[in-house]
Amino acid sequence: MNKQAATEKLVAVDIGNTSVNIGIFEGEQLLANWHLGSVAQRMADEYASLLLGLLQHAGIQAGELNRVIMCSVVPPLTTTFEEVFKTYFKATPLVVGAGIKSGVKIRMDNPREVGADRIVNAAAARVLYPGACIIVDMGTATTFDTLSESGEYIGGAIAPGIATSAQAIVEKTSKLPKIEIIHPAKAIGSNTVSAMQSGVYFGYIGLVEELVRRIQAELGQKARVVATGGYASLIAEGSRIFDIVRSDLTLQGLRFIYQMNKV
C-alpha cells in the first residue's frame, strides 16, 4: 500500500433531528468526532465555517478530505451538507439511501420505510456483533432494531426519546418546570424537580427494558443488546439490560457502507 492510500481520510456524517454527528476516519481509526446542532435554517456557509474551524483545531487539513458519506433523517440538511462538501471540500458525498449497498437484508413490509440511520446501525452491528442483535438508539426518538441470527433486519419498535418525553410533560402542563435529565440517586423525589427527574429517568429505563424483553421473547433466543445514541451512556448507568454501549456505532456503520460502495 502506498503512503497516499495509507493516509486517506473519510468523513462520516450522521444528520439527526437534534444534532449532526461528524467523524473523521483514517483507516479504521476515528481521529476526531464532533456534534453540531441540527438547524434547518442554518446556511451551508455557516456549517462550513464551523466545520473548517473544528478541523483546524484538530490539525486536519480540509484538502485531505475528499471522501464523504452521509446518512440523514432531515432532508433539508441533507441538501445543506451536500452543498458544504461540494463547495468547500470539492467532494460529492455518498448519501445512504435506495440503491446503496449496506450488506443488510431488510425483511419489512416496506423496506423503503426504514430510516437510513437504522440501516446504518444494522450494518455496523452485523459486522461488529454477528448473530442475533437488538440495537437501541437513544436520541430524539428511541429506536429498537432487531437483527436475526443470520444478520437479517426483521423490524423493531419506535418510542419517544427521553428528552422528547421530558419536553412533552413540560409543554402539556401549566406548572411543571423544565428539568435537567440526570441519573437520580433515588426513585422517591423530595420536590417537584426531583420527582420529575425520577419519573423521566426510571420510567424511560422501564420502557427500554420492557421492549427489549418482549423483543427477546419474540425472537425466542438471547440476542446481544447494543446501546448507542446521545443518551446511551446515561441510561446504561441505571440499567443492566445492555451488553455493549457503543457511541460511535452509526459512524462505524457509515465507514463499513462506504467500503462496500467505493469504486
Swiss-Prot record:
GO terms for biological process: coenzyme A biosynthetic process. ATP binds at D14, I15, G16, N17, T18, S19, V20, N21, T140. Pathway: Cofactor biosynthesis; coenzyme A biosynthesis; CoA from (R)-pantothenate: step 1/5. It is an enzyme of class 2 (transferase). Its cofactor is NH4(+); K(+). GO terms for molecular function: ATP binding; metal ion binding; pantothenate kinase activity. It is found in: Cytoplasm. K(+) binds at D137. It catalyses: (R)-pantothenate + ATP = (R)-4'-phosphopantothenate + ADP + H(+). The keyword Metal-binding applies. A monovalent cation. Ammonium or potassium. Its EC number is 2.7.1.33. Catalyzes the phosphorylation of pantothenate (Pan), the first step in CoA biosynthesis. Belongs to the type III pantothenate kinase family. This is Type III pantothenate kinase. It comes from Dehalococcoides mccartyi (strain ATCC BAA-2100 / JCM 16839 / KCTC 5957 / BAV1). The gene is coaX.
